[in-house]
Design a protein with these regions (language model features):
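A membrane-periplasm/extracellular boundary helix in multi-pass inner-membrane enzymes
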Residues: 220-263, 278-285
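N-terminal signal-anchor transmembrane segment
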Residues: 1-45, 58-77
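Long extracytoplasmic/lumenal interhelical loops at the membrane interface
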Residues: 267-271, 275, 289-332
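Membrane-interface alpha helices of multi-pass inner-membrane proteins
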Residues: 9-14, 186-201, 368-374
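Transmembrane alpha-helices of multi-pass inner-membrane enzymes
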Residues: 166, 343, 362-374, 378-411
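Hydrophobic transmembrane alpha-helices and their immediate junctions
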Residues: 226-228, 331-367
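Aromatic-anchored transmembrane helix interface
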Residues: 29-35, 55-68, 80-107, 120-123, ...
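Alpha-helical transmembrane segments of multi-pass inner-membrane proteins
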Residues: 98-109, 113-143, 154-221, 242
Length: 411
């Protein structure tokens, strides 16, 4: 169990700079989990365990259901001209299903995870973040303004980084009991991922990251003196101002896009996103498993050319609609949209299932995915799906009743 736990943490943290091996390690963790479920697990009291963890189990089932919606669609509608969409959804769906299976085993065996493993995982996560900074710096040094590392685009890289930052914060919160050391690790993590996200210049991810940090500060500082609140807000404001200055070109571009949209010119980046949201609703498939990607594209293209004449939107809709719910509804039909809504609902419920005690990491994770999913599609890229699924596994373990010996080890 401890080996699987460490493998998953390493998989998440190394995904952007080590090619192929993180996915292989993920599969190894999955196979070990399946082996544990079939041959090694003690099933005594299983029914009682299910009842006491029903919300967490519902969240795991929603992950499996979400993966199944992607996998089934890719098998029913094998596109001839948009093969990469089919391949990504096939691989991503499979990885999400395996994440749910692995999480089930680790959740059942969470009491076996030692305090030393939690500390090692936290340190590993921070070190891998620093290594990502190094590889990102090397990429910028050769003249690439918006780094993408091993992902398919800078935006994908940024979304993975936000998920990695949530995992890093959560592991630090779990493993470091000394308030001073924890604060130092928090600050280091904040600087690491602020710099990484700045190198991607992805506005949505940077905004989401600062919201995540603010919510985390609210939980961590709720019982401290007001002057510490002031210092924390001052630090975030200063760094945020520095990032805003560094990204002023992208901010001016966004402002210009909004001005153009007010003049009914939707042929801009932001304008095209509003057009895609409208088109996605009009071409949504009310069938159970959705429609072919080419069929959706042709319907959406005709609608946009008739109502908006936005060349930017027509170019983008070939692959996705820049919104997770609209994307699922328009492509994977009723099954897809129900699956992703259940994922969000059960995820938020699982983060606050205990009275007066939140799973802060899971809450931040779900909030980040929801916010980023409003302006882009997260599950279309297989590596993103793997990181999201694997991160859910770890975060779900961070606040379980079975972890009493972790608390004892701190005392």
């Amino acid at each position: 169990v401890n080996i699987i736990f460490i493998l998953i943490v390493f998989t998440i943290g190394s995904d952007l700079f080590i090619e192929a091996y993180p996915r292989k390690l993920f599969y190894i963790g999955c196979y070990l989990s399946i082996f544990g479920l079939l041959f090694l697990e003690n099933w005594k009291g299983f029914r009682q365990w299910l009842l006491s963890n029903k919300i967490a189990i519902a969240f795991l089932l929603s992950i499996v259901l979400l993966g199944a919606s992607k996998l089934i669609w890719s098998m029913i509608f094998p596109s001839t001209h948009l093969q990469d969409i089919k391949d990504n959804y096939y691989a991503g769906g499979k990885l999400l299903i395996l994440s749910g299976v692995m999480a089930f085993y680790l959740l059942k065996s969470v009491s076996v995870i030692s305090f030393q493993s939690w500390k090692f995982a936290a340190c590993t996560s921070v070190v891998l973040g620093l290594l990502t900074v190094w590889f990102g710096y090397q990429e910028q040094a050769i003249g690439i303004n918006r780094i993408k590392l091993l992902a398919d685009a800078a935006t994908t890289t940024a979304y993975i980084m936000v998920v990695q930052s949530v995992l890093c914060f959560s592991l630090i919160k779990k493993a470091v009991s000394n308030q001073l050391y924890r604060t130092v690790f928090y600050i280091a993590t904040f600087f690491i991922f602020s710099y990484l996200l700045l190198m991607t210049e992805t506005r949505g991810a940077i905004g989401t990251f600062f919201i995540v940090c603010f919510v985390l500060a609210c939980f961590e500082l709720r019982n401290v003196k007001p002057r510490y609140w002031f210092l924390a807000l001052l630090a975030i404001s200063v760094i945020g101002g520095g990032i805003a200055y560094k990204m002023q070109k992208r901010i001016v571009e966004a402002y210009d896009n909004i001005q153009q949209l007010q003049k009914n010119n939707a042929n801009t980046s932001l304008g095209a996103r509003f057009v895609m949201l409208d088109a996605g609703q009009h071409v949504a498939s009310f069938s159970l498993f959705g429609q072919d990607a080419e069929q959706r594209y042709n319907k959406a293209r005709q609608y946009i050319e008739k109502n908006y004449k936005s060349a930017e939107a027509v170019r983008a809709i070939k692959y996705h609609f820049h919104n997770d719910i609209i994307e699922s509804f328009s492509l994977q039909g009723l099954f897809g949209v129900i699956a992703i809504i259940l994922f969000y609902v059960t995820g938020f419920l699982a983060s606050c299932e205990k009275k007066n005690k939140f799973n802060v990491g899971l809450l931040l994770y779900m909030s980040a995915l929801f916010l980023m999913g409003l302006t882009d599609v997260l599950f279309i890229q297989r590596n993103t799906a793997m990181v999201i699924g694997a991160c859910a596994v770890i975060l779900l373990l961070c606040q379980r009743d079975e972890n009493k010996k972790i608390e004892n080890a701190r005392q």
